[in-house]
């Protein structure tokens, strides 16, 4: 039993990476200490939201027991394997959306961004984030464009039109309109306005904010 525990302990540290400290202080003081202990301001127990993490241990959100969009996992649902590449995120066993894909965050209901306090200029990583609180060596920034799950649309876009958008801009379009097959678009024509072409001039930070405000209504 002792040998088995020692083996698992060694595998744990190798898997976590030596980058985070040979003494294990990072895992003890930041990762494990945050398990079920991260306190988000005004948190509603029934509210679902995701966390984003910048330039840190991939699975830190899992240690903290908080749903997140950055992870390293060998067992990945097909839906994720299909969705992430579609919106310009490299997908293998690691999910690491880049900060230039800022519109993906509200689309995935990201409410907070955690950044190590050693990082500089963190407040400018993505548009629409304001400092909220600090805990376990991280500064947490709240996403002003956070969208709770279950938002609705008044506009639809045919999949064939959505497919013409560059990968890095598809999340922007998907905030403005829900992607539908031709049959679904025609079936819902009485309740959805069709986005027949993409206005690329609106696919920026301001356009994202406007789309988020529309989804909130």
Where are these regions (language model features)?
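A generic secondary-structure signal for well-formed alpha-helical elements
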Residues: 5-11, 15, 83, 87, ...
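Short, surface-exposed, polar/charged, turn-prone segments marking secondary-structure boundaries
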Residues: 26, 77-82, 89-90, 141, ...
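Short alpha-helical segments and helix-capping/turn motifs at coil-helix boundaries
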Residues: 30-41, 96-101, 117-119, 124-127
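Luminal/periplasmic acceptor-recognition loop/helix of membrane-associated glycosyltransferases
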Residues: 69-107
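Flexible, solvent-exposed extracytoplasmic
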Residues: 71, 104-217
């Amino acid at each position: 039993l002792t040998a088995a525990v020692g083996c698992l302990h060694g595998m744990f540290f190798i898997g976590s990476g030596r980058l985070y400290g040979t003494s294990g202080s990072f895992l003890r003081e930041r990762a494990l200490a945050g398990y079920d202990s991260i306190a988000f301001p005004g948190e509603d127990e029934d509210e679902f939201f995701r966390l984003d993490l910048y330039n840190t241990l991939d699975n830190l959100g899992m240690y903290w027991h908080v749903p997140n969009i950055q992870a390293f996992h060998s067992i990945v649902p097909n839906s994720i394997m299909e969705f992430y590449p579609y919106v310009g995120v490299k997908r293998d066993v690691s999910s690491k959306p880049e900060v230039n894909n800022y519109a993906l965050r509200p689309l995935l209901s990201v409410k907070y961004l955690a950044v190590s306090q050693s990082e500089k200029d963190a407040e400018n990583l993505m548009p629409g984030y304001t400092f909220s609180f600090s805990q376990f060596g991280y500064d947490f920034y709240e996403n002003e464009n956070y969208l709770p799950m279950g938002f609705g649309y008044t506009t639809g876009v045919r999949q064939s039109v959505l497919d013409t958008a560059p990968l890095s801009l598809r999340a922007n379009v998907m905030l403005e309109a829900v992607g539908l097959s031709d049959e679904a678009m025609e079936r819902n024509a009485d309740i959805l306005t069709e986005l027949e072409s993409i206005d690329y001039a609106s696919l920026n930070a301001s356009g994202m904010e406007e789309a988020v405000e529309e989804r909130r209504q």
